[in-house]
Structures are given as structure tokens and as C-alpha cells.
From Swiss-Prot:
Positions that bind ATP: N46, Y470, R566, H594
Cofactor requirement: Mg(2+)
Pfam families: PP_kinase (PF02503), PP_kinase_C (PF13090), PP_kinase_C_1 (PF17941), PP_kinase_N (PF13089)
Catalyzed chemical reaction(s): [phosphate](n) + ATP = [phosphate](n+1) + ADP
InterPro entries the UniProt entry points to: PP_kinase, PP_kinase_C_1, PP_kinase_middle, PP_kinase_middle_dom_sf, PPK_C_dom2, PPK_N_dom, PPK_N_dom_sf
An annotated GO BP: polyphosphate biosynthetic process
Lineage: Bacteria, Pseudomonadati, Chlorobiota, Chlorobiia, Chlorobiales
Gene symbol of the encoding locus: ppk1
Native source organism of the sequence: Chlorobaculum tepidum (strain ATCC 49652 / DSM 12025 / NBRC 103806 / TLS)
Keywords from the UniProt entry: ATP-binding, Kinase, Magnesium, Metal-binding, Nucleotide-binding, Phosphoprotein, Transferase
Chain positions recorded as Mg(2+) binding sites: R377, R407
Superkingdom, taxonomy of origin: Bacteria
Function, as annotated: Catalyzes the reversible transfer of the terminal phosphate of ATP to form a long-chain polyphosphate (polyP).
NCBIfam families the UniProt entry points to: poly_P_kin, PRK05443.1-1, PRK05443.1-2, PRK05443.2-2
Name of the protein described by the UniProt record: Polyphosphate kinase 1
Length: 698
């Protein structure tokens, strides 16, 4: 099981995932036109983050002289070489798709990207006048010579490298102008007076083009020889010595500020940039040639997300209104609904509103005594945090673990943590050495029979915005066995993290890997007795070597294993004698597949766990994660049916072969787009009323 050929490199597997995202833009029949643009933007943003975190980490290993090989047999240097080759190929595919297909198709729909040089002189004059008024005051020209140090360039900044000639002295100079991130990257010409406002014909101009045309205003005594675009990506991973941190909040604030100064890991340049300017940047940014990427066209494509604001419904996905079974029947009493039986929702097909309503109702209910909750990514305008603040202000006991180390959400979470503290909530910033990624809410309510505990347990964040875009399960219960263990977990989080006696919950870093492998081994034993055994797992990533090896053992024993893995998968299915009984698919579609579900047939007494944990070392060892059991057999069957539907997808699913390559699933079975099927079923259910609907939504 230690043979490197049995495994796929983690970093390359992630790049293969992002290639599947890009394919949603490339394939013309998959999405409306503007939605295809969205996938170009998502692909580009994903790749930026990959360099900021993953590539930066491997670069540090190389700098430290580390040559330890990954489980698939690659050294850090070898990984960087393969990453570079794959990224160059993917960027070419992206630009071919954008410039050769999508932009011409948009132009045919009256949405055009224009070049300044192609505009009539009258319109150029209007734009130049607008530049002087709206852009020029924001710009800062920065010289580089013996009297001016090389200018600092922030992470993800788009810049212009300018060659200047002193007219009087004939000396060649260099300067830099940053394209302001506070201004829209795409200038909508229809909104500029004097350039027309025909809504049927929208024109966009990259802001950097307009700046380049007006550089003479910034350097009035010099001749502009040439200007070239370039873009910087820096190491954005925050290193925190938590054992030495006296105040975690202040330490993370300092770390967020330091993110601007991380080492440069990628320099994007235009191919026309002359060698001496290229070398000047390489030398002063202290990078190597392998960090430089030549990119035709505009640099930094995540800004294309701005096009989603265009009001052209025919070029976008048809709006979907999620099903909310409480709309007519809840009567404001979600607690009675939970008391009548466990509730399971599948977002975004089921509305996220009941989750918000649960917290809001708990905050306003005079019989609710306390609310405890974990928060990881909640968004910038969170109704859930506002409800918690309302609860604290009304005198309820409110305890909230706000994970300050949630990457790229640190500043937002710091703001919410302070706001909660200001109204009297008990706020925990996280645990030393661990990120708390679990999704838990515990509400204690006074009722005629005594105090009663209500739970919301989820696979996704407490964020209504992502609740419309990510597929996740929400589970409501008043089960005392689960409530007791969740109470113990909250006490461990707010006190000292030492409790280990969980019988029902799987809690990382305590028992998740151990219990998952035990359940795999149980299927192996059952398969050997009866030639049966079935495992279905759905997750974002499968990386953990010990779990992969357990799955290989299960396959060799005859257990039938189906894995739905959205992103990274280091397991190779279909290898004779090793993994021929394992199938791996990945679904990429309108919604981001985000739920985690682990189903074990258990000889006819199936067990199902849902929760926050992927099968990665970081989730099993370095985070507080939870997987919770679903006891209701009807709900277990419902989730199994969800998984089987996804496994039958032959329109949006990809499969991985024994060689580690991904191909689209294509067969002669009836066509199935699982996400569309879930939406269609909810649309058909919208006239259904009554709590019984919770058992038959799928």
C-alpha cells in the first residue's frame, strides 16, 4: 500500500478539479452565456488562492531544503515543476475560451469589450475628459531610481510598468502605477455621459487601457516609451505562533496585516514586456524565472464576476426559488416542529430560511434561556449574528465560538467577535493549534416538562448567501443522546478541550479517523462473511493516507465503494487487485457541492453520518470537526437516495480512471443532471404542506 503509483498528487488533483470548473465555461451547452463567464471568474479566483496558499507553502519547503517526497513520490521541487506545466496549459485554455468563444458570443448579444484605440476620436475625447475627473486624482506615479526605492506592490495588485525617456537628457527611466482596486475594473461606457445609453448594446473597457492612454498626464515632462501590465501574487498564509500569543485576536489582526508583505510567488506579465523590464521586476521582487507567467490579454480575471450584474435574464440561469415547508404550516413555532420529529433540509433546494428563523426565534422566545453556536464563515451582513446579539441584549446566555483563523475571513470574523462581546455575549476566539470548523447550534428552552435542548447540526456554514449557492444538509433534532454530547463538546470548547467520551458524535481530532476506519473494517468483515458490503461517501476532498488504504483493503475484500468527491482525490480507483471495486465521481454544476455524507450498509442496518469533516489530515488532526449520526431510518434512506441520484448523474459528473485522469461520465442510461433533478422535485413540492413533507422531499 506504500507504492507511490497507487496515489495521485494532492496539488495536481486540485488543479484537475479547477480544470473541471473551467470546463463549465468551455462547454457551450452547459450554461447560459453570462454563467459561463462566472466560471471563468471562479476558475481564476481559485487559481489565485491556490498560489497564495498551496504554492507558497511548497516554495517555503524548497527554500528550507526539504526534499521529503509526498505519498505519490514527488519532491517539493518536482511538484512545482508539474504545477507550472499544468497551470500554463490551463491558462491557455482559459484565454482561448474567453477570447475565442465567450467574448464573440457576448458581442453577438450586444455586450462588447472595446479597445480605446478602436473608438471614434469624439468618444476618446469624452473618455479622456472623464479620466481626468474620475481616475486621475486616485493615481499615484512611483519612480524608481537612486532617490526612489523600488515601490512596494501589494498582493493581487494590477500594475503598469512604464518606460520613460527624459526629453532633455535622453535617460531611460522606470516608473510604476498601480491600477486602483477601489475603482471598477470594467468601465461600463453606457454609464458615462456622452457615450450613449442604449441598453441593448453594452460596451465595456478595461480600466487599465484608459490609464495607459493617459500616462502622459502623470509624467508631463517625460516621453512615454512603453507601458506594460503586470500582476503580483504573494504568499497569503498567516503563520501564528499560538502558544506564544498573549491575545489571539490581536495576533491574528497583525497576521492579516502582514499578509500584504508575503513573498511573491507569481508574477503575471504581458508577453510584450521587454527583457530588461522583466529582469528588473524579477530582481527587485526577489523571485526566479519559474515564478513568471506570460499571459496574453487581461491579467486577473476574477473581476469578470462584475458581468453578473448585467440585467439580461435570457443569458443567466433561470431563478430558482427554494422549497420552504414552513411557509404555510410553521405558524412561528419551529420548536414544536422539531419536537414532532427530526427535520432534514438539503440546501439550496430547501430554503436556508428555517436555519435563520431557528436562531431568530430562539433569540426572541422568552422561554429560551441560552444559545450556543460555532461560527466559521458567516458573511458581512449576517442575520444570524444579529439574532445572537439580540439574544445577548435581552439577557439570554449566549456563547459563541467565532473562529478567527478562518482563512480570508479573519477580518470579518474579528468584527463580529467584537460586536458580540460589546453586547455581552461570551465569545471564544478558537482553540490553540486547532481550527473549529464544526457547524453546531444548541438552544436550551424552558418547557412545562422541564428544560429541553434543541440542536441544529450542519454540513455547511451559517451563511444565508452561500446557503443559496452551496449544497449542504441541515439537521434539526431534540434527541437527548445527541444533545448531551453536543453539550459536552460546547463545554470542551468554552472550557478546556479534554473531553473524549463521545459515543455517538465523531469529533476531530479525537475519534473521527478511528471511527471511520472502524466502520470500513466492519464492512470488510461483513463482505468476507456474505460477499456483500457497501460504502458511499460524499466529501469535498479525499487525501488521508490511512483512510485511503482502508478503502483499498475494503475493495480487495469485495466491498462495493462509491465516492462522490468534488475536489481533491488522492485515491486511484479501478486498479486490478487494489481498487477495482471503487468508483469515484465528481459533480461540477450550477451549485457548489459542499455536503459531507458517509453511508455504511452495515449488513442491512445502515449507518449514516453527516457533518463538517472531509477526509484530509487537516480535518482529522488539526481541526475541531463533527460528524453526527442520523438515527431516523426514513431520513437515512432519503440521504442514500440523494447519493444514488448523484451517482446516476451522466451530464454533470466526471469519473476518475486508474491512471488518475478525469473524463466525463457518458453512458446510454436516461440523461440525469442531479442538481436539476433536485430543483425539479422541489418545484413540484411547493404546493405540498404539512410537516410530513420532511420525510419525502426527495
Amino acid at each position: 500500500m506504500s507504492d507511490p503509483s497507487l496515489y495521485i498528487n494532492r496539488e495536481l488533483s486540485w488543479l484537475h478539479f479547477n480544470r473541471r470548473v473551467l470546463d463549465e465555461a468551455i462547454r457551450q451547452d452547459q450554461h447560459p452565456l453570462i454563467e459561463r463567464v462566472k466560471f471563468i471568474a471562479i476558475f481564476s479566483s481559485n487559481l489565485d488562492e491556490f498560489f497564495m496558499i498551496r504554492v507558497a507553502g511548497i516554495e517555503k519547503q524548497v527554500e528550507a531544503g526539504i526534499r521529503k517526497k509526498t505519498i505519490d513520490g514527488l519532491t517539493p521541487s518536482e511538484q512545482l515543476e508539474r504545477i507550472r506545466a499544468e497551470v500554463i496549459e490551463q491558462l491557455k485554455l482559459r484565454n482561448t475560451c474567453l477570447y475565442g468563444d465567450i467574448l464573440p458570443a457576448l458581442a453577438a448579444e450586444g455586450i462588447t469589450f472595446v479597445h480605446f484605440a478602436d473608438l471614434p476620436e469624439k468618444e476618446q475625447a469624452v473618455l479622456n475628459a472623464w479620466f481626468r475627473k474620475e481616475i486621475y486624482p486616485v493615481l499615484t506615479p512611483l519612480a524608481f531610481d537612486t532617490g526612489h526605492p523600488f515601490p512596494f506592490m501589494s498582493n493581487l495588485s494590477l500594475n503598469l510598468a512604464i518606460e520613460l525617456d527624459e526629453v532633455e537628457h535622453g535617460n531611460l527611466k522606470f516608473a510604476r502605477v498601480k491600477v486602483p482596486s477601489v475603482l471598477p475594473r470594467l468601465l461600463k461606457l453606457n454609464d458615462i455621459e456622452g457615450l450613449g445609453n442604449d441598453p441593448s448594446c453594452m460596451r465595456f473597457l478595461w480600466i487599465e487601457e484608459l490609464i495607459q492612454q493617459n500616462l502622459g498626464l502623470l509624467f508631463p515632462t517625460m516621453k512615454i516609451v512603453q507601458s506594460h501590465q503586470f500582476r503580483i501574487i504573494r504568499n497569503a498564509d498567516i503563520e501564528i505562533e499560538e502558544d506564544e500569543a498573549g491575545d489571539l485576536l490581536q495576533t491574528i489582526e497583525k497576521g492579516v496585516r502582514s499578509r500584504r508583505y508575503g513573498n511573491v510567488v507569481r508574477l503575471d506579465i504581458s508577453p510584450e514586456m521587454p527583457d530588461f523590464v522583466r529582469q528588473l521586476l524579477i530582481n527587485n521582487l526577489e523571485i526566479e524565472e519559474k515564478n513568471v507567467y506570460e499571459i496574453d490579454g487581461a491579467l486577473g480575471m476574477s473581476c469578470l464576476m462584475e458581468l453578473l450584474d448585467i440585467d439580461r435574464p435570457s443569458l443567466k440561469d433561470e431563478p430558482f426559488i427554494p422549497f420552504n415547508m414552513f411557509e404555510e404550516q410553521r405558524n412561528g413555532d419551529i420548536f414544536s416542529a422539531i419536537s414532532s420529529g427530526d427535520l432534514l433540509f438539503y440546501h439550496p433546494y430547501d430554503s436556508f430560511k428555517p436555519v435563520v428563523d431557528f436562531i431568530d426565534r430562539a433569540a426572541s422566545d422568552p422561554d429560551v434561556l441560552s444559545i450556543k453556536q460555532t461560527l466559521y464563515r458567516v458573511g458581512s451582513n449576517s442575520p444570524i449574528v444579529k439574532a445572537l446579539m439580540k439574544a445577548a441584549e435581552s439577557g439570554k446566555q449566549v456563547a459563541v465560538l467565532v473562529e478567527l483563523k478562518a482563512r480570508f475571513d479573519e477580518e470579518n470574523n474579528i468584527g463580529w467577535a467584537r460586536a458580540l462581546e460589546d453586547v455581552g455575549a461570551h465569545v471564544i476566539y478558537g482553540l490553540p493549534g486547532l481550527k473549529t470548523h464544526a457547524k453546531l447550534t444548541l438552544v436550551v428552552r424552558r418547557e412545562p416538562q422541564g428544560l429541553k435542548r434543541y440542536l441544529h447540526l450542519g454540513t455547511g456554514n451559517y451563511n444565508p448567501s452561500t446557503g443559496k449557492l452551496y449544497t449542504d444538509y441541515s439537521f434539526f433534532t431534540d434527541d437527548e443522546l445527541l444533545a448531551g454530547e453536543v453539550s459536552e463538546l460546547f463545554n470542551a470548547l468554552t472550557g478546556y478541550f479534554r473531553y473524549t467520551g463521545y459515543r455517538f458524535l465523531l469529533v476531530s481530532p479525537i475519534n473521527t479517523r478511528k471511527r471511520i476506519i472502524e466502520m470500513i473494517e466492519r464492512e470488510i468483515a461483513l463482505a468476507r462473511k456474505s460477499s456483500g458490503g457497501r460504502i458511499i461517501m460524499k466529501m469535498n476532498s479525499l487525501v488521508d493516507p490511512a483512510t485511503i488504504q482502508a478503502l483499498y483493503r475494503a475493495s480487495r475484500a469485495g466491498v462495493q465503494i462509491d465516492l462522490v468527491v468534488r475536489g481533491i482525490c488522492c485515491l486511484k480507483p479501478g486498479i486490478p487487485g487494489v481498487s477495482e471495486n471503487i468508483r469515484v465521481i465528481s459533480i461540477i454544476g450550477r451549485y457548489l457541492e459542499h455536503s459531507r455524507a458517509y453511508y455504511f450498509a452495515n449488513g442491512g442496518s445502515p449507518e449514516l453520518y453527516l457533518g463538517s469533516a472531509d477526509i484530509m489530515p487537516r480535518n482529522l488532526d488539526d481541526r475541531v470537526e463533527t460528524l453526527f449520526p442520523v438515527f431516523d431510518p426514513s431520513l437515512v434512506e432519503r440521504v442514500r437516495n440523494d447519493l444514488e441520484l448523484q451517482l446516476s448523474d451522466n451530464l454533470k459528473a466526471w469519473k476518475i480512471g486508474p491512471d488518475g485522469n478525469w473524463t466525463l461520465v457518458r453512458n446510454d442510461a436516461p440523461k440525469v443532471n442531479s442538481q436539476e433533478r433536485f430543483m425539479k422535485r422541489r418545484t413540484q413540492k411547493k404546493k405540498t404542506t404539512g410537516i410530513k413533507g420532511r420525510l419525502g422531499l426527495n
